[in-house]
Amino acid sequence: MAQITEVAPDLFRITTFLEPFNLQFSQFLVRDAEPLLYHTGPRALFPAVKEAVASLIDVRTLRWIGVSHFEADECGSLPEWQQLAPQSDAVCSMVGKLVSVDDCLALRPAKGMTDGEVLETGKYRFRFLATPHVPHCWESGLMFEETQRTLLCSDLLHQNGNVEPVTQSDVVGLSRDVLVEYQQGPLANYMHYCTLTDPTLQRLAALQPKTVAT
């Protein structure tokens, strides 16, 4: 069963811990006039995530499905969600729309966003931030909710283990430990460093988010 935590007003973290992988998979539901589900989870977790979302909203009213980059835990069950919610559209970077999401997965054309574009869901405004290769993937893009100053930051600050849903402690060290650990196995180079990395991280820090949702 997924754990549900309200981490900011109307923003719910839905988390399933898979012990064999020592890893949490999290999705974020924004409860608003046009509900937004940021990340779908992989297909294997669709029943659990659907049950959690259904406890918060009528799943048929889901309007937006956020895809930060093209991996199973970000968008694996997108078709299932779009079948369940007939008015829902995927929202992703323009690169993601053009090179993968529309052709490989979405049942309907995705809303491709360019850097700085704003998506309004009702009370909340999500500014799209193009972040190619940060944390990974060419099509990567994050969302910053300007009303409550919440950064939906995808795999940035990734941590292993069944960690607490909300913390005010520094998690940079924990995230660095994961990167070092991953370098020893098949998940090496999980987040690489390139000329885009530092300016992108500096840009995100300059937003001064109150909440970082990862």
Regions found by a protein language model. Give the residues of each.
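Conserved beta-strand hairpin/beta-sheet module of binuclear metal-dependent hydrolase folds
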Residues: 2-54, 142-153
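Metallo-beta-lactamase
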Residues: 6-9, 89-214
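Short, flexible loop segments at the rims of nucleotide/cofactor-binding pockets, characterized by
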Residues: 13-19, 41-43, 67-69, 127-133, ...
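A general structural motif
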Residues: 33, 59-62, 87, 147, ...
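Active-site neighborhood of phospho(di)ester-bond hydrolases with catalytic His/Asp-centered motifs
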Residues: 38-40, 62-70, 90-94, 151-155, ...
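Active-site metal-binding motif and surrounding structural segment of the metallo-beta-lactamase
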Residues: 45-91
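Active-site environment of divalent metal-dependent phosphoester hydrolases
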Residues: 70-75, 97-100, 117, 135-136, ...
